Design a protein with these regions (language model features):
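Conserved RecA-like ASCE ATPase "motif II neighborhood" in helicase/translocase motors
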Residues: 140-161, 165-175
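Loop/turn-to-beta-strand initiation segments
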Residues: 87, 139-142, 156-159, 183-188
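Interdomain "pre-motor" coupling segment immediately N-terminal to P-loop NTPase/helicase cores
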Residues: 1-26
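Conserved glycine(s) of the Walker
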Residues: 68
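Pre-Walker A (Motif I) flank of P-loop NTPase domains
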Residues: 55-61, 87, 157
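Conserved P-loop NTPase nucleotide-binding/switch module
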Residues: 95, 100-106, 168, 172-193
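Pre-Walker A adenine-sensing motif
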Residues: 40-55
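Conserved P-loop
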Residues: 62, 71-139
Length: 193
């Protein structure tokens, strides 16, 4: 820890000289959505995410809102699950917008957090038929949880996406990055702006 300076980290995160192999998987469809729509990289940066995930176990996808970072990551996770490369998908976000007012909302914790986690559910609904998605969620093959729930876990045989990583504290990010176990892929998305 604390081996790289802030400037070195910034340089590594903003580097744009990643070589793309045009013959690789980044140009092919990732998968077919429930409506039959082909889900594939639509931009150079989405292809970079695919290429990076194929070469690395941990990828930081940094860019403005609405550029497909999370959607591309979730599509890659669903593909890995379908191909039996992983046993589960874990999607997480820091629940900062939910703040301390959760206790005043009606329902259990899931009811309180679901609106904040809705963008993740929306992406999954595009890619997995409703009944199968329901079963995956019930069986915890797909888990959607706030970042605080990752503490103390070791995540093996999983595809894990931390969405909205810019909203984490230093200690939350450190805690998350140390959860990686065997045969696990991590994608951390964020918007530095």
């Amino acid at each position: 820890y604390d081996i790289l300076s802030d400037n070195e980290i910034e340089t590594l995160l903003t580097k744009s000289d990643l070589e793309l192999d045009t013959s690789n998987e980044s140009h092919k469809p990732i998968l077919h959505g429930v409506s039959g729509r082909v889900i594939k990289a639509r931009t150079l940066n989405q292809r970079k995410i695919i290429d990076s995930v194929m070469k690395n176990d941990m990828v930081f996808a940094i860019g403005p809102a609405g550029t497909g970072k999370t959607y591309t990551g979730i599509a890659l996770a669903v593909k890995a699950l379908k191909n039996k490369n992983v046993k589960k998908i874990i999607l997480t976000r820091p629940a900062i917008e939910a703040g301390e007012n959760l206790g005043f909302l009606p329902g259990d914790l899931k009811d309180k957090l679901d609106p904040y986690m809705q963008p993740l559910y929306d992406s999954l609904k595009d890619m997995i038929p409703a009944e199968k998605l329901k079963k995956y969620l019930e069986d915890e093959v797909i888990q959607i949880a706030p970042l605080a729930f990752m503490r103390g876990r070791t995540l093996d045989h999983a595809f894990v996406i931390l969405d909205e990583g810019q909203n984490t504290t230093h200690s939350e990010m450190k805690m998350f990055l140390t959860r990686m176990g065997k045969n696990t892929k991590f994608i951390i998305t964020g918007d530095p702006g």
